[in-house]
Amino acid sequence: MFGVLNSNDHRAAVQQRNIPAFGRTSFEPWTDNPTSNYRCETGGNGRDSGQNRVRRPMNAFMVWSRDQRRKVALENPQMQNSEISKQLGYQWRMLTEAEKWPFFEEAQRLQAMHREKYPDYKYRPRRKALPQKSDKLLPAASSSMLCRQVLVDEKWYPFTYRDSCSRAAHSPMEDQLSSSRPVNIANSLLQQEHHYRSTSLGDSPETLAAHLSADPPFYPKEQLGLSDAYFP
């Protein structure tokens, strides 16, 4: 009932079935056909997503480096693509105009074919991604210097406050001047306080000294920016 198949016939039938399937699934990234550059690719930036994007026609350098890149990659399998591109660019610059001329002619022919095949083609370069700005760190600029006023005995006295970021960018001379400024403010405030009390109170010097020692003036060091409360 069942016929016996010959082993040679069975092997030939299997090979005949596998050859078309292999031909459909095989892919060669580098081909010698210049028209392979016109194949459309899917993807790209946001506006080309999901649509077929037409590649630009090859220029003279691309025509020349198409075979040279494969040759360098086979000779140096450990070399990265960026290094291969640098080496190819150096070799291209070393060629003479006579050596480059055949590749320019081939590039012109490919561009003419590209214009005939895609008459409405327009080159649209991809947009470069802009670096994201971070607002976490503020630069040590003049904006970090805060000018405030202190109310002492119904009078406003300006003073300057600097944060830790701007203080690190100042010179030693500026630090010395800024450290001596609060002391001068304290001295002037004391002198004004003594003058105010001496004019408002018509008492003897002994009574005035006793009153000052019993009721010293209060100057908050947080507002004045003093490291230590210094009073002569």
Swiss-Prot record:
Species of origin: Pusa caspica (Caspian seal)
PANTHER family (alphabetical): SEX-DETERMINING REGION Y PROTEIN (PTHR10270:SF161), SOX TRANSCRIPTION FACTOR (PTHR10270)
GO biological process, any: sex differentiation
Region (Disordered): 24-53, 196-215
One Pfam family matching this protein: HMG_box
Function: Transcriptional regulator that controls a genetic switch in male development. It is necessary and sufficient for initiating male sex determination by directing the development of supporting cell precursors (pre-Sertoli cells) as Sertoli rather than granulosa cells. Involved in different aspects of gene regulation including promoter activation or repression. Binds to the DNA consensus sequence 5'-[AT]AACAA[AT]-3'. SRY HMG box recognizes DNA by partial intercalation in the minor groove and promotes DNA bending. Also involved in pre-mRNA splicing.
GO molecular function, one term: calmodulin binding
Primary residence: nucleus
Subcellular location: Nucleus speckle; Cytoplasm; Nucleus
Subunit structure of this chain's protein: Interacts with CALM, EP300, HDAC3, KPNB1, ZNF208 isoform KRAB-O, PARP1, SLC9A3R2 and WT1. The interaction with EP300 modulates its DNA-binding activity. The interaction with KPNB1 is sensitive to dissociation by Ran in the GTP-bound form. Interaction with PARP1 impaired its DNA-binding activity.
Protein name as annotated: Sex-determining region Y protein
Residue ranges for the DNA-binding region feature of this UniProt entry: 54-122
Keywords assigned: Activator, Calmodulin-binding, Cytoplasm, Differentiation, DNA-binding, Nucleus, Sexual differentiation, Transcription, Transcription regulation
SUPFAM superfamilies registered for this protein in UniProt: HMG-box (SSF47095)
Family recorded in the similarity comment: Belongs to the SRY family.
GO cellular component terms listed in the entry, alphabetical order: cytoplasm; nuclear speck; nucleus
Phylogenetic placement of the source organism: Eukaryota, Metazoa, Chordata, Craniata, Vertebrata
